[in-house]
């Protein structure tokens, strides 16, 4: 009996997770990062960049639904959406489900990620790249937000961790530029790692967003392959009421949206996602401006 091939993630140096590989589908170095796509028994196809899991077929819906429907339904009338990163197509797929959105721009630094995910993860994008509202720009997201004259109602930063190509998407200058290109009433959200294991990252984001937005907070979801507890998503706007919408209003917006086949998101999950664990509340309070 042949020994199974194992792949070990290298996000943390002293602990981690591994996957038993059925088949390596692709492995190479792009212009920006090491990329591997492999098939597994438990999680289907998996993509990792620089030895860190980015997405899996089995649980991607949790991440993509929460990164998309929470801010879109909280905003209530977003017409123009900017996606930073998101080359696997999952965020795009979910944004395209909102008929009220009229323009979607996605800025991805790595063309190879887009091409390979279209080939190996067809259910992630589900044809969304052909949506007439969509434009793809191959560029560094930090450079794009510094230079663009476009304005947006929602910015979704679907970045990697703050290492390698994704490092610039966690800097104060990036958040300042995002604030500049948001319309009045606009909203910014970003993935921010697993707060129990990456609390420094969460606190850094909080401190760097505070100078540019009057309301900065986080919401959360549990995503199995982002192990170690709940994953946090940064939330920044000029209107604190956007994260305080009542359950009745959320149910009404959800019903009107036509989102009938969500697998994770619902208005109750949305409402509850802003409830943060006490250790995180206390850590953020220590860093809040006096």
UniProtKB/Swiss-Prot annotation:
Enzyme Commission numbers on file: 2.5.1.16
Domain PABS: start-end pairs: 5-238
Involved pathway(s): Amine and polyamine biosynthesis; spermidine biosynthesis; spermidine from putrescine: step 1/1
GO terms (BP aspect): spermidine biosynthetic process
Catalytic activity: S-adenosyl 3-(methylsulfanyl)propylamine + putrescine = S-methyl-5'-thioadenosine + spermidine + H(+)
Domain of life: Bacteria
Alphabetized CDD domains for the sequence: AdoMet_MTases
Chain residues that bind S-methyl-5'-thioadenosine: 33, 108, 140-141, 165
GO molecular function: spermidine synthase activity
GO CC terms in record: cytosol
InterPro entries: PABS (IPR030374), PABS_CS (IPR030373), SAM-dependent_MTases_sf (IPR029063), Spermi_synthase (IPR001045), Spermidine_synt_N (IPR035246), Spermidine_synt_N_sf (IPR037163)
Binding annotation for spermidine: 64, 88, 158-161
Enzyme class of the recorded protein, top EC level: transferase
Family listed: Belongs to the spermidine/spermine synthase family.
Quaternary structure (record): Homodimer or homotetramer.
Function text: Catalyzes the irreversible transfer of a propylamine group from the amino donor S-adenosylmethioninamine (decarboxy-AdoMet) to putrescine (1,4-diaminobutane) to yield spermidine.
Protein name, per record: Polyamine aminopropyltransferase
This protein's encoding gene: speE
């Amino acid at each position: 009996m042949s020994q199974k091939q194992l792949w070990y993630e290298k996000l943390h140096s002293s602990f981690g997770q591994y996957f038993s590989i059925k088949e390596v589908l692709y492995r190479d170095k792009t212009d920006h990062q090491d990329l591997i796509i492999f098939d597994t028994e438990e999680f289907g196809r998996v993509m990792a960049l620089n030895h860190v899991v980015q997405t899996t077929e089995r649980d991607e819906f949790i991440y993509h639904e929460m990164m998309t429907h929470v801010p879109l339904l909280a905003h209530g009338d977003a017409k123009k959406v900017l996606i930073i990163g998101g080359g696997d197509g999952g965020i795009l797929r979910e944004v395209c489900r909102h008929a009220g959105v009229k323009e979607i721009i996605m800025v991805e630094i790595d063309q190879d990620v887009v091409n390979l995910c279209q080939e190996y993860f067809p259910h992630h994008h589900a044809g969304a790249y052909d949506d007439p509202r969509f434009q793809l720009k191959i560029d560094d997201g930090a450079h794009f937000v510094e230079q663009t004259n476009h304005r947006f109602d929602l910015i979704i930063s679907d970045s990697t961790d703050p290492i390698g190509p994704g490092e610039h998407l966690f800097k104060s200058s990036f958040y300042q530029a995002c604030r500049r290109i948001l319309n009045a009433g606009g909203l910014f959200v970003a993935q921010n790692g697993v707060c129990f294991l990456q609390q420094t990252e969460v606190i850094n984001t909080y401190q760097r967003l505070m100078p540019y937005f009057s309301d900065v907070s986080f919401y959360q979801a549990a995503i199995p392959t982002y192990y170690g507890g709940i994953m946090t998503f940064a939330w920044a706007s000029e209107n604190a009421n956007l994260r305080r919408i009542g359950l009745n209003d959320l149910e009404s917006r959800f019903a009107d949206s036509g989102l009938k086949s969500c697998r994770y998101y619902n208005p109750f999950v949305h409402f509850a996602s802003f409830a943060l664990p006490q250790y995180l509340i206390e850590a953020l309070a220590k860093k809040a401006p006096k």
